[in-house]
Amino acid sequence: MKSPMILVSSGRTMGSLSMQRQQSALYGMCLALSGGTGVLSSGGDARTLAARCDGLLLAGGGDIHPSRFGQPVQSEKLSIDPVRDEEEQALFQAFFSRGKPILGICRGIQAVNVFLGGTLRQHIEGHSDCCHRVRCIPRLAALAGAAPMVNSYHHQAVDIIASSLHAAAWAEDGTVEALLHETAPLLGVQWHPERMVPPLCDDAAGANHLPLFRWLCERC
């Protein structure tokens, strides 16, 4: 059986070049362990890419420009890449319109929410470079556990949830940590599961979030 091809979308605001390579390698290994093949996006026509690939992974990275959700810039801590915003919105629409599965990670969950009409909190405290527990609904608990320990590397967060999405996990302070679509194969998580797959990487001791990548590959 042919391995599903998963397009991994990333940008230029993920940090140093070495960090970008490490992050891309982790996504690739997690997808390979899940039966898929990761293909790093390097631009191109979104509709053509969606026709060639079986699924989309919206990777972590910088912040989404507030103009995308109808707000002025309110935080000096934003790291914005408008070109990436535009490219990923085109990719999202191309894959989503074809009913192909999409997994959003960190920035990716925020992008999914914005692209479907939701909004973001531009800056929150206490969610950068730490680990904490989240409470998951049963549908997500089947993949991640009911109250898993997760990592946290973000300062933007989901605010108003798009009407076609619903919250699937929350941090103890009420921050939305996961979103699921009502009908489409679309899942977003605020944490970085690629860093929680022992022995590749283990930010949260004992956690293994490879099933999230299997979810993506199995729906192709």
List the predicted regions and their residue ranges.
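N-terminal beta1-alpha1 cap of cysteine-dependent amidohydrolase-like domains
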Residues: M1-I105, F115, R121, E125-M149, ...
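Hydrophobic, aromatic-enriched interface-forming segments
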Residues: I109-A111
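Conserved catalytic core of two-component histidine kinases
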Residues: A169
